């Protein structure tokens, strides 16, 4: 992939190399009563790592609860229930937080917003992405803007970004 210009032909889904994202603990994350729960009976996890996991779970569960999200126990992903019969909601989720996982969020930006961020640059992105000012996506504003500007993503469509809020990095992105 050309780092200077990521187009539809070059990018279906991209993974960004990142340090420890805590993804190795995904198998121990369960869903109980619409909350993410860490279930590992072995003592092979350091107390510091366990504390980090529990902090993330607490923050994520609070976000899920406060925003009336529903966690799918099979996918371990929280989303809002959207009644698809309403034609006004067909484009729901193109801008904002599309999905919440225990240690990351998927942030969506529509074509217009990607174009605005690309032209405004990283410094101007904070204003354009102000809708993410709270919750687990808040720290993702600069990270997402950095990927858009650094990779010079084309604006033929919207993009999604996976933001790991433990490492505060974008770990993947692709077209909406």
Question: Which positions does each model-derived feature cover?
Answer:
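Soluble non-cytosolic domains of exported or imported proteins
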Residues: 47, 112-120, 135, 139
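Short hydrophobic membrane-inserting alpha-helices and related fusion/pore-forming segments
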Residues: 124-142
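N-terminal propeptides/leader regions of secreted preproproteins
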Residues: 3-103
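Canonical hydrophobic alpha-helical transmembrane segment
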Residues: 5-6, 138-150
